[in-house]
């Protein structure tokens, strides 16, 4: 699925470039990374001082080293706009780090040494930031709190507008009806059988004719004794062939049928109103569950719970 993951707040792939603007332009990322860095520095400096005066728990050194790489990883993921790609791993590392920092707080907070108490304060800050990050990165992009937080970021897209949906028919499934354009003839091909009113190809004759006799007078039928030039019969045959092709294209057998299997399920992350000029599109509401048959293009063949089928833009859906 072409997820357009940027709209989820950090969905670039592993090849995304490092850009500090993704941190500076996101108040949430900037604040949490700054607090985590400050907490780590407080804990690190205080641990060095506490280790000079008296014995310091070795376990807390491991917690400091571990959280250093966790903060570095979160910073790189946000700066590279790759949060959506690595959010599962980030939550796992943060959960383990939360255990380490809270254990360090328990081993330092009850000492009378001011340095150890300061180190415990730094670990408390790290624990608080870890809880916030787990709640943020561990939630779906459609969660209300994530959408509220992401709305303040400069680089994170929001609900796509109808003006951005300039998708061509080449990306659509085979659900649109097509018809062959009628072939046009010039005067030399008609050889004197031109008519002042256009021929529509309907059995009733030309458009605007009041009676069938009036429209048929310009074109004598074979049984009426008319003399035809040599090139009339090929024209008549070709016209009949075109009419037959047009009937074949509009017959029920030639029309596209929706698929019978919908192996995928998708959730609407935004509400969508179908284009009134396109009968193939369907409307749906935010958080509505749709069944999808094909996810290879920008427009997906979808089926609603009420049985309504049609095409839906992929950038409004997320696979479940």
From Swiss-Prot:
It holds the Pfam family SH3_1. Residues 261-320 form the SH3 domain. GO terms for biological process: regulation of actin filament polymerization. Keywords: Cell membrane, Glycoprotein, Membrane, SH3 domain, Stress response, Transmembrane, Transmembrane helix. It is found in: Cell membrane. The lineage of its organism: Eukaryota, Fungi, Dikarya, Ascomycota, Pezizomycotina. Residues 1-29, 81, 139-320 are cytoplasmic. Residues 160-182, 196-260 are annotated as: Disordered. Plasma membrane osmosensor that activates the high osmolarity glycerol (HOG) MAPK signaling pathway in response to high osmolarity. It comes from Hortaea werneckii. Residues 51-59, 103-117 are extracellular. This is High osmolarity signaling protein SHO1B.
């Amino acid at each position: 699925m072409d997820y357009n993951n940027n709209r989820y707040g950090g969905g670039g792939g592993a090849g995304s470039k490092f850009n500090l603007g993704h941190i500076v332009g996101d108040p949430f990322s900037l604040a949490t990374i700054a607090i985590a860095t400050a907490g780590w520095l407080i804990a690190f400096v205080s641990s060095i001082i506490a280790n000079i005066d008296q014995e310091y728990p070795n376990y807390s050194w491991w917690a400091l080293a571990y959280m250093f790489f966790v903060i570095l990883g979160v910073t790189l993921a946000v700066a590279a706009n790759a949060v959506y790609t690595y959010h599962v791993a980030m939550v796992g590392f943060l959960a383990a780090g939360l255990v380490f920092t809270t254990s360090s707080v328990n081993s330092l907070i009850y000492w009378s040494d001011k340095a150890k108490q300061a180190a415990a304060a730094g670990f408390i800050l790290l624990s608080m930031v870890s809880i916030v990050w787990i709640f943020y990165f561990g939630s779906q992009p459609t969660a209300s709190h994530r959408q509220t937080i992401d709305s303040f970021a400069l680089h994170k897209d929001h609900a796509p507008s109808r003006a951005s949906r300039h998708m061509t028919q080449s990306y659509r499934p085979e659900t649109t009806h097509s018809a062959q354009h009628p072939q046009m003839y010039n005067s030399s091909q008609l050889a004197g059988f031109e008519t002042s009113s256009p021929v529509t190809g309907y059995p009733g004759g030309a458009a605007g004719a009041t009676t069938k006799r009036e429209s048929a007078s310009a074109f004598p039928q074979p049984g009426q004794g008319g003399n035809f030039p040599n090139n009339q019969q090929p024209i008549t045959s070709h016209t009949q062939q075109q009419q037959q092709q047009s009937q074949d294209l509009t017959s029920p057998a030639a029309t596209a049928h929706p698929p019978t299997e919908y192996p995928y399920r998708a959730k609407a992350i935004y509400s969508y109103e179908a284009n009134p000029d396109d009968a193939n599109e369907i409307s749906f509401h935010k958080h509505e569950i749709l069944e999808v048959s094909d996810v290879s293009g920008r427009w997906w063949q979808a089926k609603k719970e009420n049985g309504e089928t049609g095409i839906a833009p992929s950038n409004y859906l997320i696979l479940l």
